[in-house]
């Protein structure tokens, strides 16, 4: 058996069950384990402040139970500069970004990794992400988590193999119910804590209220494919492709009963484009153009290849053909047309269980 007693691992403790069990499992494997709680957002709201304080308290309780120290660090400035500013700029441009992906790339596997190595003397960091890693021929691959329902490789595609080589993912080999069972067996306070939802810095607040604090909304027309104005939107940034609820345009005269869907944004004229029916052609794309490629092996792709792609989290894999247009731009053609391919979101590529990397969707291709 490997002697890990001199191998120091700093676990990112969020105050949730996954990171709690990660710390416990690493301890069982003989590692020298310490915890680190990251504060990435300066709360300005009482409910948010209370939630963050509760998370820290829960992380401390778990570390006390395991008999390990808990360090704390404030990355709010780095988060604002590298994640939040980008998030706002994308919304302003009419796209729908994914801040969790940026947070993993810039904070958890960059700022945290550097701090753990340089200031705390870590050999590895660990997180509660549902992914796995595998070493093959001197390379480190990122693999989907074993629990299909919880696999988080979609959110980690932008991390390079150097970072993955320095990271451990203990719960990636387990299914979620097993993780909760271990936490309960070990009497960890987080065993029945519900999974956090929503974007880390918004918490449980209403998204529209949050955005309005930072970006002034500009109301405009809601328009059909024939150019008919059928309503008013409160701001393009509040809407995303494929959205059906919250449009406020039900029960129109001369229209059938089919629901309306957002099919596009006309940024120049501040108009929201909608069409009726889940099978309306305007909702579907045969492919996409993506930029800002991040390959796990950090090697730009030079020739056309086959793989599968996800254009959003929890989506079924779509077989596709990928053609690099240059080192930072890809053209992706799906085997079957896909609904609601959304600029700003990420296209993430897979070869079976291996996550190859991904890129940001720039535009969807329509016939």
Swiss-Prot record:
Q: Which UniProt keywords apply?
A: ATP-binding, Cytoplasm, Disulfide bond, Nucleotide-binding, RNA-binding, Transferase, tRNA processing, tRNA-binding
Task: Quote the InterPro entries the UniProt record gives.
Answer: MnmA-like, MnmA-like_C, MnmA-like_central, MnmA-like_central_sf, Rossmann-like_a/b/a_fold
**NCBIfam families in alphabetical order:** PRK00143.1 (NF001138), trmU (TIGR00420)
Q: Which residues form a coiled coil?
A: none
- Region of interest called Interaction with tRNA, as start-end residue ranges on this chain: 150-152, 312-313
UniProt site (Interaction with tRNA): 129, 345
Regarding protein family, the annotation reads: Belongs to the MnmA/TRMU family.
Region: Interaction with target base in tRNA; residue ranges are 98-100
Q: What's the protein called, per UniProt?
A: tRNA-specific 2-thiouridylase MnmA
**Which transformation does this protein catalyse, written as a reaction?**
S-sulfanyl-L-cysteinyl-[protein] + uridine(34) in tRNA + AH2 + ATP = 2-thiouridine(34) in tRNA + L-cysteinyl-[protein] + A + AMP + diphosphate + H(+)
Can you tell which superkingdom this protein's organism belongs to? Answer: Bacteria
GO MF: ATP binding; tRNA binding; tRNA-uridine 2-sulfurtransferase activity
Please report the organism this UniProt entry assigns to the protein: Psychromonas ingrahamii (strain DSM 17664 / CCUG 51855 / 37)
Q: What does this protein do?
A: Catalyzes the 2-thiolation of uridine at the wobble position (U34) of tRNA, leading to the formation of s(2)U34.
Under the cellular component aspect of Gene Ontology, which terms does the record hold? Answer: cytoplasm
Compartments where located: Cytoplasm
Task: Give the positions the UniProt entry annotates as the active site.
Answer: 103, 200
Q: Which gene encodes it?
A: mnmA
For the ligand (ATP), the binding residues are 12-19, 38, 128
What CDD domains does the record tag this protein with? MnmA_TRMU-like
Q: What is its EC number?
A: 2.8.1.13
């Amino acid at each position: 058996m490997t002697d890990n007693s001199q191998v120091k691992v700093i676990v990112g403790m969020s105050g949730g069950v996954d990171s709690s069990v990660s710390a416990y499992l690493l301890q069982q494997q003989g590692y020298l384990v310490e915890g680190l709680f990251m504060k990435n957002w300066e709360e300005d709201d009482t409910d948010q402040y209370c939630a963050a304080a509760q998370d820290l308290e829960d992380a401390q309780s778990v570390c006390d139970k395991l008999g390990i120290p808990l360090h704390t660090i404030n990355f709010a400035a780095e988060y604002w500069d590298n994640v939040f500013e980008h998030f706002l700029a994308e919304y302003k441009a009419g796209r729908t970004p994914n801040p969790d992906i940026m947070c993993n790339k810039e904070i958890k596997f960059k700022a945290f990794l550097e701090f753990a190595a340089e200031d705390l003397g870590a050999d590895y960091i660990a997180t509660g992400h549902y992914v796995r890693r595998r070493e093959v021929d001197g390379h480190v691959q990122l693999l989907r988590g074993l629990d299909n329902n919880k696999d988080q490789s979609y959110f980690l595609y932008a991390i390079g193999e150097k970072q993955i080589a320095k990271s451990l993912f203990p719960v990636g080999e387990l299914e979620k119910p097993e993780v909760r069972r271990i936490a309960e067996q070990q009497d960890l306070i987080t065993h029945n804590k519900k999974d956090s939802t929503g974007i880390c810095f918004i918490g449980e607040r209403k998204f529209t209220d949050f955005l309005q604090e930072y970006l002034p909304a500009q109301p405009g027309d809601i328009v059909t494919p024939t150019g008919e104005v059928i309503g008013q939107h409160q701001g393009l940034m509040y809407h995303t492709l494929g959205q059906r609820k919250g449009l406020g345009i039900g029960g129109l005269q001369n229209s059938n009963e089919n629901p309306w869907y957002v099919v596009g944004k006309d940024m120049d004229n501040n108009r929201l484009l909608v069409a009726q029916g889940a099978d309306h052609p305007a909702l579907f794309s045969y492919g996409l153009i993506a930029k800002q490629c991040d390959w796990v092996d950090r090697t730009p792709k030079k020739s056309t290849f086959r793989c599968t792609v996800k254009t959003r989290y929890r989506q079924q894999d779509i077989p596709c053909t990928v053609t690099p247009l240059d080192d930072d731009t890809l053209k992706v053609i799906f085997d079957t047309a896909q609904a609601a391919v959304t600029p700003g979101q990420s296209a993430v590529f897979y070869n079976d269980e291996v996550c190859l990397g991904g890129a940001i969707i720039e535009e969807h291709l329509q016939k």
